[in-house]
Amino acid sequence: MASIQDLYETVSRVLGNQAGKVISALGEITVECLPEHYISVMTALRDHEELHFELLVDLCGVDYSTYKNEAWQGKRFAVVSQLLSVKNNQRIRVRVWVSDDDFPVVESVVDIYNSADWYEREAFDMYGIMFNNHPDLRRILTDYGFVGHPFRKDFPISGYVEMRYDEEQKRVIYQPVTIEPREITPRIVREENYGGQ
């Protein structure tokens, strides 16, 4: 198994300027790329004989609209993929920043990694990130009539509608949420108050 530094150098050399940034931090390698290079970066990571990242272990969306309790200045959405090379016993992360915050779209990697199918559907369902050329991009965790994307940071915690069984209609119905929205402020305990002093 090669070291993290060796992997960093190999990835930087193989991807060249297709990788916007190659970051080595906390014992991990992260490749950040632009949407127009996403497919070529993922293909190179899978097919290059020195890398051979043949497994997509995970793919998820991320909403950076507020990050570290402050307003985020960059792009709002990213798609993050975790790749594994069984042959080399190495892992790598690929982050692609989605260009449009209002209508986030990125290319699908289903043709490169079959396992991306349901992961991309989940990112679409939860974050509203569209994946071009996905064979079956539809909701996977929420109802077909669900409004909004619940993992977006601007989605209300209680949601917009609730469902319940209506005895008169003998079916499940949707109705506006009856929970009063409120701000929850945590109680702060200072050290000087420890121990009942």
From Swiss-Prot:
GO terms for cellular component: plasma membrane. Keywords: Cell inner membrane, Cell membrane, Membrane, NAD, Quinone, Translocase, Transport, Ubiquinone. NDH-1 is composed of 14 different subunits. Subunits NuoB, C, D, E, F, and G constitute the peripheral sector of the complex. GO terms for molecular function: NADH dehydrogenase (ubiquinone) activity; NADH:ubiquinone reductase (non-electrogenic) activity; quinone binding. InterPro entries: NADH_DH_suC (IPR010218), NADH_quin_OxRdtase_su_C/D-like (IPR037232), NADH_UbQ_OxRdtase_30kDa_su (IPR001268), NADH_UbQ_OxRdtase_CS (IPR020396). It catalyses: a quinone + NADH + 5 H(+)(in) = a quinol + NAD(+) + 4 H(+)(out). This is NADH-quinone oxidoreductase subunit C. It is an enzyme of class 7 (translocase). It is found in: Cell inner membrane.
